[in-house]
């Protein structure tokens, strides 16, 4: 006789299975809505539908686009993109990949063992922010360095790999969505899953939309972390504490918000009214107020007071104060950048001023091509064709009778 042994789970608690099924159903329904939209513009509009309008309107193009990063962090990587744009050189894609992989965020992942639900949420948010910042950097490469074939082909392939539900960002987003209560954070889940269905063309062209997304994700994640009971001093780096407290003040998570609002209202209403017994003080204030002349408008000020604008040549410009803080992200562009910053040197081998200043002509042609066009380049050629005034022999005073010179 054959016996068939089966194993069954006789526990009556199926809340975990129902919660998992609900999460899968919510993520699946949101994904179906984006997959049903064929055009990329329709997917973008569907994402904008669930994004609230930022309080300051549209973000500027040169604003910080990294989530939970300081302005200095963003400026460092943005200057690397400007370095590639201004000084084109043969660049290895592996070098760009190393720079992209070094992009992180100021939110530290949790290292506590065993992790609590708040620690898991902190780690998931940190990973999503880091991958989002890397995606933004790749999109900026594709947007600003469109005249370099190697950079464009690399950025196009990287954007294709980093978009979609099967990418590294997609895996981390689904893990974060699984940790969120969908009833309270349905809009955030919709935005996170909507990011995965945007096309590489949208990421490369919609820089303002990226700023809108950054503002929404940063405030939503910070609100989520504070509701989970985490402390800013423990989860963020020290250099980001002031920025985090400023955002908390804006979204109303500090106790001093009400006092600050009362102070702002009192400042807008003006100074308090004086008593009847203080009429003399009011008269003195009126006399002083009427005695001071009204300041002139900028357009009515004398023109001599304005500072004239002078154009300084590139070789005479002084380095900025924070030049030591700037770092070259791409070493292969150092040679080109050093040539552009080099001062022109004048050589005088024969002593008669016959040798032309080739280095000065090259620098003038480079400046003319960037600023004034072909007219300035012709001027640069004429300047280079004339002998340098520094090599002209000086005239000596004649004390003896004038005699004819024999050449």
Curated annotation (Swiss-Prot):
Residue ranges with Acidic residues bias: 273-286
Example of a GO cellular component annotation carried by this entry: host cell nucleus
Residue ranges, compositional bias (Basic residues): 302-312
UniProt main location, coarse: host cell
Region spans: Disordered: 268-330, 388-407
Keyword Nucleotide-binding: no
Record keywords, A-Z: Host nucleus, Transcription, Transcription regulation
Localization in the cell: Host nucleus
Regions annotated as coiled coil: none
Biased segments, Basic and acidic residues type: 287-301
Keyword check for Transcription: yes
Domain of life (superkingdom): Viruses
Cited function: Acts as a transcriptional repressor of the US3 gene expression through a specific DNA sequence named the transcriptional repressive element (tre).
Family (UniProt): Belongs to the HHV-5 UL34 protein family.
Protein name (record): Transcriptional regulator UL34
């Amino acid at each position: 006789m054959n016996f068939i042994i089966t194993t069954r789970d006789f526990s009556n608690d199926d809340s975990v299975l129902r919660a998992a099924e609900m999460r899968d159903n919510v993520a699946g329904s949101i994904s179906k809505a984006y997959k049903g939209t064929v055009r990329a513009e329709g997917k973008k509009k569907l994402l904008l539908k669930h994004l609230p309008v930022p309080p300051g309107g549209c973000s500027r193009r040169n604003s910080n686009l990294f989530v939970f990063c300081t302005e200095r962090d963003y400026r460092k990587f943005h200057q690397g993109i400007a370095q590639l744009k201004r000084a084109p050189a043969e660049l290895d894609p592996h070098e760009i990949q190393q720079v992209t992989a070094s992009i992180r965020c100021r939110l530290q992942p949790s290292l506590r063992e065993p992790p609590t639900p708040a620690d898991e949420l902190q780690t998931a948010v940190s990973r999503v922010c880091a991958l989002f910042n890397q995606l933004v950097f790749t999109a900026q490469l594709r947007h600003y360095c469109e005249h370099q074939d190697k950079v464009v082909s690399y950025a196009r392939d990287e954007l294709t790999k980093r978009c979609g539900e099967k990418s590294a960002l997609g895996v981390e987003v689904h893990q974060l969505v699984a940790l969120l209560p969908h009833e309270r954070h349905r809009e955030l889940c919709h935005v996170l899953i909507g990011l995965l269905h945007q096309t590489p063309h949208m990421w490369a062209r919609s820089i303002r939309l990226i700023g809108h997304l950054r503002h929404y994700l940063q405030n939503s994640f910070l609100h989520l972390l504070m509701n989970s009971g985490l402390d800013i001093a423990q989860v963020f780096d020290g250099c980001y504490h002031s920025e985090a407290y400023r955002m908390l003040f804006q979204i109303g998570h500090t106790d001093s918000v009400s006092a600050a609002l009362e102070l702002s209202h009192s400042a807008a209403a003006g100074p308090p009214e004086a008593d009847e017994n203080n009429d003399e003080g009011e008269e003195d204030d009126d006399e002083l107020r009427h005695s001071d002349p009204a300041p002139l408008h900028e357009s009515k000020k004398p023109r001599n007071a304005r500072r004239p604008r002078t154009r300084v040549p590139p070789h005479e410009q002084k380095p900025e104060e924070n030049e030591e803080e700037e770092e070259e992200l791409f070493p292969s562009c150092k040679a080109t950048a050093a040539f552009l910053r080099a001062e022109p040197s004048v050589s005088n081998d024969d002593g008669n001023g016959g040798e032309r200043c080739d280095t000065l002509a090259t620098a003038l042609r480079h400046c003319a091509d960037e600023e004034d066009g072909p007219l300035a380049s012709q001027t640069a050629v004429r300047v280079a064709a004339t002998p340098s005034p520094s090599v002209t022999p000086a005239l000596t005073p004649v004390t003896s009778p004038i005699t004819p010179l024999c050449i």
